[in-house]
């Protein structure tokens, strides 16, 4: 909250971690069918920074890599850049940049050779794209919970000061098991199932 408010106002807020968002690299189905099912973190960094420009360089088809990314203001991009790319800047000048994760997914689906990233919540049905493992670890909630998969963050709710009884009851409901099972069906992780609470 401190990057959005001045420090004095931010100090009044109490942070409540309410769920987990896992981000997954996704590729056009033709790339996956040609054998790209997993990339090392170094390969992922090389692709998203524009150094690797053809899929054959990472065991895929002889096809140009098309980057589909989010803008610099995106929280999805910030999380992916920090944990999947080790903080390396994406080659935005060489990518199709979109403000919306749903549009990004459609662009990856419809563009030969495309790669991008979305939250698992966008992949609950038949999305028409394939996820890519990082260093052999699939982007799943189970692998996020165990701490094996590295690209995740918490979603937050904030209260001004400690929550009152009604707000506490709502937060308990949001973070409880019954609501948690619904969140998992929608691709969101349950905070209490995390074995790691920090990266």
Predicted segments — roles?
Residues 1-199:
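Exported/periplasmic ABC-transporter solute-binding proteins
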